[in-house]
Amino acid sequence: EMCIRDSYKGVIHTGIDGATGYNIMINAVDHPYNSFYVWEQLYDKAGNPIEGAYVDQNGDNKIDEEDLVAYKKSAPDVFMGLTSQLSYKNWDLSFALRASIGNYAYNNVQSNREAWDGSQMYDQTGFLKNRLTSAWKTNFKTGQYRSSYYVQNASFVRMDNISLGYTFNKLFNDKQSARVYVTVQNPFVITKYDGLDPEISGSGVDNNIYPRPRVFMLGLNLNF
């Protein structure tokens, strides 16, 4: 899926944190809208990325701007949803499910926080920054911001909410009833994405360091 650019690059856009002047996306002829614009990463036998090792696309024995390629895209191939309301005797169950398939995201949280150089290890006051456990896998000494390694599969299936209830008929008399229910918002998401949340804004660049909350609610409806 890697394609070498023609002489006209296209519209290069969308900056990233940690790398001033680097734009990570491109709109170009013959490529999907909002493709990522990166160097094609090379890997060792164990499947780990090799620092500074990229495919020399034009064969000139150096890695530079001419080796950047359009790679993957931020838009999904398929977006779907499913809602349902089920009931059995006094029980009722409802849920809302969504899926986004074929979309990718640039994990800027990892690319900006994995390297072991001073600028990524310490803040401006000299204190250690929070480290990502993934830094032990890449072991990059300096930031590899333009690596295709950070363009990750962000397809997902998310349960937005699910609710289970039970209705007590004839609570005190024939005219009174009560329904007890429990609802969970954002109970789970199924994804291969390494970041906190695969559901990225339209830019396709993930700078999210805060998890989406999971909310539990217990309710009671009374009918008189």
Spans of features found by a protein language model:
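Repeated loop/turn-to-beta-strand initiation elements of outer-membrane beta-barrel proteins
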Residues: 90-94, 171-172
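Transmembrane beta-strands of outer-membrane beta-barrel pores
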Residues: 5-6, 88-90, 99-103, 161, ...
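Conserved small-residue
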Residues: 1, 5-74, 192
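Outer-membrane beta-barrel proteins
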Residues: 5-12, 49, 102-108, 118-119, ...
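C-terminal beta-signal and terminal closure region of outer-membrane beta-barrel proteins
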Residues: 17-48, 120, 126-127, 131-132, ...
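Residues that define the transmembrane beta-barrel architecture of outer-membrane proteins
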Residues: 76-80, 87, 155-160, 176, ...
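Extracytoplasmic gating/loop element in the C-terminal half of outer-membrane beta-barrel translocons
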Residues: 19, 31-36, 43-48, 100-185
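Membrane-embedded beta-strand positions of outer-membrane beta-barrel proteins
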Residues: 95, 180-182, 220
